[in-house]
């Protein structure tokens, strides 16, 4: 997996420009691990977060949707010998998390894809996070541009945190802003972002 420099830009922009007046706990690079999120869940601390924002790689397995994942630091090999996890937080593992978040944002490629099954509906990460306790989940429907994602997420959270907008209203407004912007106007940059409520 290649590095995503925009994720650090994204996290820094959220910390410095959006979440300045609320409690904020940042886990980046080595601390952003599958092992860490599972430990937070097991201890009950993950349930204390009203927003869980994961800026990382996403993986969709078209042959076996249950293997679709959010990818953490272990995948890079940087935590070899430190973590027993493989770095792939799969759909079954996600559904077992202990969440009570108003928003889980998967700022990663292909996190909104799933497999539609008769009698079950869509098997995918959005549903797994909702089963785990998230009230809403923001995802992407395809591979997304790193820089555009950082800009989209920063604007979206600013509208929610600073302007008091709902998440759905913030998503609509940021998409409209992107459409009107010469740099971000192409649907590739904004249309992938959807919100499940």
Where do the protein language model's features map onto the residues?
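Catalytic cores of enzymes
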Residues: 1-197
């Amino acid at each position: 997996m290649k590095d995503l420099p925009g994720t650090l830009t994204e996290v820094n922009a959220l910390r410095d420009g959006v979440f300045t007046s609320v409690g904020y706990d940042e886990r980046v690079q080595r601390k952003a691990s599958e092992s860490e999120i599972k430990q937070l869940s097991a201890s009950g601390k993950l349930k204390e977060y009203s927003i869980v924002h994961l800026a990382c790689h996403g993986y969709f397995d078209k042959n076996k949707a249950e293997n679709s994942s959010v990818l953490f630091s272990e995948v890079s090999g940087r935590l070899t010998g430190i973590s027993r996890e493989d770095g792939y937080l799969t759909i079954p593992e996600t559904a077992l998390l202990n969440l009570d978040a108003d928003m889980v944002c998967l700022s990663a490629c292909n996190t909104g894809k799933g497999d539609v099954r008769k009698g079950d509906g869509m098997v995918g990460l959005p549903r797994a996070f909702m089963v785990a306790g998230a009230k809403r989940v923001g995802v992407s429907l395809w591979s997304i541009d790193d820089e555009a994602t950082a800009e989209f997420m920063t604007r979206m959270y600013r509208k929610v945190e600073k302007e008091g907008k709902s998440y759905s209203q913030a998503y609509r407004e940021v998409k409209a802003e992107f459409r009107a912007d010469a740099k971000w106007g192409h649907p590739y940059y904004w249309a992938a972002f959807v919100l499940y409520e």
